Amino acid sequence: KQTILLSGFDGLAELYMESLPQGTPLHFAVRANEPIPPDVAYSAASTIKIPIMVSVFNHLGEPTPDLALGWMRGMITQSENPPADALMRTYLDENLGPLMVTEDMRALGYQNTFLAGYFYTGAPLLQRIQTPANSRTDVYLDPDFYNQTVPSEIGDLLARIYRCVAAQDAQNTDLFPGSVTPNECQTMLNLLAENKIGALI
């Protein structure tokens, strides 16, 4: 935070960092060199594919079908959109798959993370979703109506996946206990580790 403030950065920066497995999160936001309340609504873009992956595992049993794993690999490691749509249509709901992802995120306590439509060109907006983050009046970044998140929620979701791997069984996780297993969480971590797209922040 001090580095950002000393640099005189006049834009908006928000950071969420957690020391795993059970560290205290560091979370702050700065705009025009002044601290502001965090959890600004952002367009989720391809980060929403992490909730899609989690949601699909929540609704699938083991062993995970090879078809699903192949689509997940394309979605996560190459950031491709068609596999994301295929996963939701096939394993969630043909028409309302994105809203099922949103429901699963709500079940985890995330009020600002949602997916309101498929990725394909011309996909309809299934629901106009209002959240605490996109209802703020002090800062508004014109986030995408189709998918949004905030750093603390996507960061916490990643932390849950990490902790799930270390759990002794599926009942001891804080990521859909009894539904998402440590083996499935390890698969998710492996896929995320394969994402080596050379894009600068």
Annotate each PLM feature.
Residues 40-63, 75:
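Active-site SXXK
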Residues 1-34, 88-201:
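Penicillin-recognizing serine hydrolase domain
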